[in-house]
Amino acid sequence: MTTIFWAGDSTVQYNDILTFPQTGIGQVMNLFLKPEVRVENHAKNGRSTKSFIDESRLTPIYDKITAGDFLFIQFGHNDEKKNDPERYTDPHSDYMVNLEKFVNAARNKGAWPVFITPLERRCFIDEEHLDIGEHTDYVAAMKQTAENLNVPLIDLYSMSRAEMRKAGAEKTKEWYMHLPAGVYPSHMDGLPDNT
């Protein structure tokens, strides 16, 4: 059986009833896979490449991953937090070095690393126009690292921006955690989260 391991942040992590309706990509991926492929999701809310590694979250992946498995690597949202030294990474130095650590962990075990650029934040300046992307430096750094290390890359950043442009500002509120007050026990005060 092939396993897809995920390393990432809240946009990927498995959520339960306590955080519903938040849903990570890795949480629902198995719905689109054949039965002989399983998902093992190690993504954790709020993590950057730095904090994920510093907290030894890569270790259990390394211990379990085997030849023919995949390691999907999706970070950027929290790496860009300059005021948080436990998470911040410079996009063109630390971030790229950390991405290489994930690649090496997979390849050392005969597995396949795959980079996935961060999902774009919902950043409209009006109903039809998106602001300049918030993750551009990290997207560029991931693309450069993918090229340098010959790692396949899925450009979720560009795809998500294109879909947001087509849908418009109001419709995309449904795709993000824009929650009305009094509806969800996990967010009784409501929530306007564009991540």
List the model feature ranges, each with a label.
Residues 17, 21, 53, 94, ...:
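Residues that cap or flank secondary-structure elements
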Residues 48-56:
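Structural motif
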Residues 10, 48, 78:
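Gly/Ser/Thr-rich beta-alpha loop segments that engage phosphate groups in nucleotides
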Residues 57-195:
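Alpha-helical cap/lid subdomain in secreted, periplasmic
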Residues 1-44, 59-67:
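Serine-esterase "nucleophile elbow" of acetyl-processing enzymes
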Residues 14, 49, 161:
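Active-site environment of divalent metal-dependent phosphoester hydrolases
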